[in-house]
UniProtKB/Swiss-Prot annotation:
Homodimer. It comes from Homo sapiens (Human). Binds to target promoter DNA and functions as a transcription regulator. Regulates transcription from the PADI1 and CDH2 promoter. May be one regulator of transcriptional events during hemopoietic development. Induction: By retinoic acid. Belongs to the krueppel C2H2-type zinc-finger protein family. A zinc finger (C2H2-type) spans 356-378, 384-406, 412-434, 440-462, 485-507, 513-535, 541-563, 569-591, 597-619, 625-647, 653-675, 681-703, 709-731. It is found in: Nucleus. This is Myeloid zinc finger 1.
């Protein structure tokens, strides 16, 4: 797509030519406004508008082009698919017809899909193709859309200024209209575009100044003549009090972004600049037309002429409001001098208002595309759906980022450890692990963090809201105080303060993130996002080996170790290795004898919280897991799963040595000790070893002379239940 500039810089219009008529497209305003706007559109225009003359040599030109391209595409932030989307969007906009292209560019779409939706909306608008006319305002001709005389209020009869002698234009078929407007029908817009590209006015157009003070005074005078009072009477409001007018009088300029009517200058000579009247109208979906004066050799300014595009012949001539249905816009132009240096500065008096205010929350946006994107938050619209898992997104860029989780593509790779990431921001955060950098420091306690989100989460512990009232972070690079860091509630110590702060959320009960489905609240946003997948059923992380899917990437990582056999967490006491760190933590309590979880009913203590939960069901009698076949209830879901295999006959655990299968994995583990000869349970009294723990328990009763199983008939006691069953058969035979 060509940038929004006209022609070549080395062609200057001849000085002896009169005013040149051009059509100023809406996209030119957007493109020139972007020259001082540090946004993606400004970066694109800087790249497309680069000229070889701006560099001192070919090497510098190539280096500048590379840098401008990098600033536009930002490969360190965007993925290849996102950069491709930018190029497709640019080409799509460039392929549109000129009028539609200007109107779509004015909305600044963020993706090709959004641009296509805008084009569809424009095609469905009522109204046929527009025709353009030549409007002569007191002796000067400009291009405008065709309008009816009833669109304007006539001026009082005044004597027009005497035009200067000069060559007369060939006779044309004209229509007389108020204000001395002479209208002649011209060809379609497409012919105007050809004229723009090949005419003498092929120069760069940039943002513009407001009216000069003397021009502003003349504008106000003529406006008083055009709109002296309303039709309700001579005492009605003037144009300055019009309810839809957004008049600004800054730096001597009068303008309400919008419809501009050019006045004939009293001393209309070569090189003079004519003033403009700006009255309100809607430029959001309007075409622009204008006249640009031929510049002097030193370079100078020229004002653009804006005429309303919504003036229809069917407009009611008796309408009391000549400015009905109009809104703000303003465009003026600036010339570049032949030396290539721009003159003037952007006008600050009345910029283009292209966004709007959200009706729901009142938030204001400078661009309509951002407003439309924001409104999807309130409507819940998510038009971009992932074909793999069905998850929907409000923006196509979010969908592309999400799809990388399915393809396992991680284009941003760490040069130190080789770990890949979907987003470059995650790579930058990961690099701080190697460098030890923690730039975000809490001003309250001095704790440093690698990520700002962790700092904001931490500040809630001190009571500082993560907003304008929060204390600013400490200077980056400040060292963290040395550990360990003990918890004031339970005295547990941690090597890092960040881990301590996460642990303290258990005691403080800080749960700032709530689920809209079930109301459950969480202390961390990441945990809330994982919880939402329980309701949606989403399992975006699938194993490439067996196809099993998981809700969390960490679960997939742990599952892969089943296929690879990796057990990275080893016990320092006995050397036993585990696939998960929590399993190792639980195992270490076997050596230390630690049992931190106590039952409040009976005082029995457990090494695992899960075991405490299961134990408490013996007091409450709760059996939340029921079999769908026989209705039998269980206190543990694992027991229900094992029970259901009785109905299905499933025996998923097979011995690789003899092929015998089992319903439970524990039974397979015990069986394999027959082949390996392993006897891990040894008696501390006599040293005898056993393959199963229950067998060791029974053996210990022989040393302790325990006989817990008593016969109800004769009172005889036994140390094994099997011995009691055999004994009871004696009484049954009698």
């Amino acid at each position: 797509m060509r940038p929004a500039v006209l022609g070549s810089p080395d062609r200057a219009p001849p000085e002896d030519e009169g005013p040149v008529m051009v059509k100023l497209e809406d996209s030119e305003e957007e493109g020139e406004a972007a020259l001082w706007d540090p946004g993606p559109e400004a970066a694109r225009l800087r790249f497309r508008c680069f000229r070889y003359e701006e560099a001192t040599g070919p090497q510098e030109a190539l280096a500048q082009l590379r840098e401008l391209c990098r600033q536009w595409l930002r490969p360190e932030v965007r993925s290849k698919e996102q950069m491709l989307e930018l190029l497709v969007l640019e080409q799509f906009l460039g392929a549109l017809p000129p009028e539609i292209q200007a109107r779509v560019q004015g909305q600044r779409p963020g993706s090709p899909e959004e641009a296509a939706a805008l084009v569809d909306g424009l095609r469905r608008e009522p109204g046929g193709p527009r025709r353009w006319v030549t409007v002569q305002v007191q002796g000067q001709e400009v291009l405008s859309e065709k309008m009816e005389p009833s669109s304007f209020q006539p001026l009082p009869e005044t004597e027009p200024p005497t035009p200067e002698p000069g060559p007369k234009t060939p006779p044309r078929t004209m229509q007389e209209s108020p204000l001395g407007l002479q209208v002649k029908e011209e060809s379609e817009v497409t012919e105007d575009s050809d004229f723009l590209e090949s005419g003498p006015l092929a120069a760069t157009q940039e943002s513009v100044p407001t009216l000069l003070p003397e021009e502003a005074q003349r504008c106000g005078t003529v406006l008083d003549q055009i709109f002296p009072h309303s039709k309700t009477g001579p005492e009605g409001p003037s144009w300055r009090e019009h309810p839809r007018a957004l008049w600004h009088e800054e730096a001597g300029g009068i303008f309400s972004p919008g419809f501009a009517l050019q006045l004939g200058s009293i001393s209309a000579g070569p090189g003079s600049v004519s003033p403009h009247l700006h009255v309100p109208w809607d430029l959001g979906m309007a075409g622009l037309s204008g006249q640009i004066q031929s510049p002097s050799r030193e370079g100078g300014f020229a004002h653009a002429l804006l005429l309303p595009s919504d003036l229809r012949s069917e407009q009611d001539p008796t309408d009391e409001d000549p400015c009905r249905g109009v809104g703000p816009a303003l465009i003026t132009t600036r010339w570049r001098s032949p030396r290539g240096r721009s003159r003037g500065r952007p006008s600050t008096g009345g910029g283009v208002v292209r966004g709007g205010r959200c009706d729901v929350c009142g938030k204001v946006f400078s661009q309509r595309s951002n407003l439309l994107r924001h409104q999807k938050i309130h409507t819940g619209e998510r038009p971009f759906v992932c074909s793999e898992c069905g998850r929907s997104f409000s923006r196509s860029s979010h969908l592309l980022r999400h799809q990388l989780t399915h393809t396992e593509e991680r284009p941003f790779v760490c040069g130190d450890c080789g770990q890949g990431f979907v987003r470059s921001a995650r790579l930058e955060e990961h690099r701080r692990v190697h460098t030890g950098e923690q730039p975000f420091r809490c001003a309250e306690c001095g704790q440093s963090f690698r990520q700002r989100s962790n700092l904001l989460q931490h500040q809630r512990i001190h009571g500082d809201p993560p907003g304008p009232g929060a204390k600013p972070p400490a200077p980056p690079g400040a060292p963290e105080p040395p550990g360990p860091f003990p918890c004031s509630e339970c005295r547990e110590s941690f090597a890092r303060r960040a881990v301590l702060l996460e642990h303290q959320a258990v005691h403080t009960g800080d749960k700032s993130f709530g689920c809209v489905e079930c109301g459950e609240r969480f202390g961390r946003r990441s945990v809330l996002l994982q919880h939402r997948r329980v309701h949606s059923g989403e399992r975006p992380f699938a194993c490439a080996e067996c196809g099993q899917s998981f809700r969390q990437r960490s679960n997939l990582t742990q599952h892969r170790r089943i296929h690879t056999g990796e057990r990275p967490f080893a016990c320092a006491e006995c050397g036993k290795a585990f696939r998960q760190r929590p399993t190792l933590t639980q195992h270490l309590r076997v050596h230390t004898g630690e049992k931190p979880f106590a039952c409040p009913e009976c005082g029995q203590r457990f090494s695992q919280r899960l075991k405490l939960t299961r134990h408490q069901r013996t007091h409450t009698g709760e059996k939340p897991y029921h079999c769908g076949e026989c209705g039998l209830g269980f206190t543990q879901v694992s027991r229900l799963t094992e029970h259901q295999r009785i109905h299905t006959g499933e025996r998923p655990f097979a011995c690789p040595e003899c092929g015998q299968s089992f319903r439970q994995h524990a039974n397979l583990t015990q069986h394999r000790r027959i082949h390996t000869g392993e006897r891990p349970y040894a008696c501390p009294e006599c040293g005898k070893a056993f393959r199963q723990r229950p067998t060791l328990t029974q053996h210990l009763r022989t040393h302790r002379r325990e006989k817990p199983f008593a016969c109800q008939d004769c009172g005889r006691r036994f140390h094994q239940s099997t011995k009691l069953i055999q004994h009871q058969r004696v009484h049954s035979a009698e």
